[in-house]
Amino acid sequence: MKDLKRKIHYWCSDTMRNKITGKGVVCAVLDTGITQHPDLVGRIVGWKDCVQGKKTIYDDNGHGTHVAGILAGNGKSGRGLYSGMAPEAQIFAVKVLNQRGGGKIRDVINGIRYVLLKQK
């Protein structure tokens, strides 16, 4: 983790010094969905599937889970070697893209609307 952060410190020096952790922040990830990854457990606070309407959280592509990990993974499953930029942030996951990573503008708009309504 130290080597990785040292190499990218020029654009994330605050995260390198652990000043920004994401604590108290809820981030929306509008993508292919999200899985219950060990590095995200307990911090997925919302779910909406705008593509198929499923109630159970899932990611049939993997991209959304990857993005969520870059954003807020805590690194526990990798023994701390890799963590996201805001490892204490909570995630509101919205599936707006299909299994192939494509989607409809309508689903993206509905996902954005849903997040905006939930924040109020």
Model-derived segments and their meaning:
Residues 112-120:
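Short acidic, glycine-rich surface-loop motifs adjacent to enzyme active sites
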